[in-house]
């Protein structure tokens, strides 16, 4: 692995794109500008062409078939260099793994190579107005009509929806069944009649989320992933991928340990690095990050996982997203009055990136299961505590 690490580090030094000359989003959740999107798409394609996206994915479908652990080394070096994130996050973290696990041979050959190279963009169609935490109450319907399904419904919080070619979509195929049993999972095309994508502007002023209206949109029957009625099982598997992915994605503004180092550097800049309270807080963040990374290592090594493997992704999602929020809040606390300034203000420290991080962090503690719900699940299913009423 050290040879690979040296190779990747040398490649990044030669190919790091640097400053594009315009504001980049902090994550795919904020991509709402065509210039940002195309720049990030080009970066992912360059990484793929170098063999650094899909490093461990099967060669026969467009991956590179490297040994286990190779992608982790690549991702670490990208994070260390603060390289741009990979924009096709829904494809890499959820859609692709689900297709590899549950898709037909035709699905794998049709989708995998294109999603790795960012030739086709994916979004996720799970949450609905009134059906977020209680996802199984979703009301979007898929009605079988010969060799097609007709989709009607409304999805929200759809990251990359305006750019997406495909959507991993949950819809109700059997309205008479109990709510968990009547759901199916689709690899749904977005560029078809009857699909309307509308922006959702966040409190940061960025519009990376979308809502998607499905109005009698017809898609072929082979868009079904798995069996009719298997959607809840597949949705649960997707959420396990999503919660595990919360620990960090390839590239981006640096992994969590780099973020802790950034806050330490901010404390030094502000002359607060000798303050024992500040030092204690920073030490706590570093300890927490060490625990998160240790759990990530356990999750990647089956021999180290307990008899409750589903607990690890839940713990990872809960601890990493709350750590990100608390860390950004502490950085703003260090900045004092300057934390009230925003991007573009000449007096703002680090161009108000910590303020932006703090406001964006709330999405992480909600998406894929709120922190409160995750605590309930861990308490009831892992610790054996009585159910909440």
Enumerate the predicted regions with their spans.
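A short core secondary-structure module
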Residues: 148, 152-198
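A short, Trp-centered hydrophobic/proline-enriched beta-strand micro-motif
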Residues: 118-126, 170
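Glycine-rich beta->alpha junctions and the first turn(s) of the following alpha-helix
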Residues: 195-294, 364
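A structural signal for short hydrophobic beta-strand segments in well-ordered beta-sheet cores
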Residues: 140-143
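Glycine-rich phosphate/cofactor-binding loops in nucleotide/flavin-utilizing enzymes
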Residues: 69, 73, 94, 232-250, ...
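N-terminal glycine-rich flavin-associated loop
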Residues: 87-106, 132
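Amphipathic, small/basic residue-rich leader segments at the start of a protein or domain
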Residues: 1-89, 110, 114-117, 269, ...
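C-terminal helix-coil-helix/basic helical segment that borders enzyme active sites and/or dimer interfaces
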Residues: 22-30, 272, 276-279, 290-347
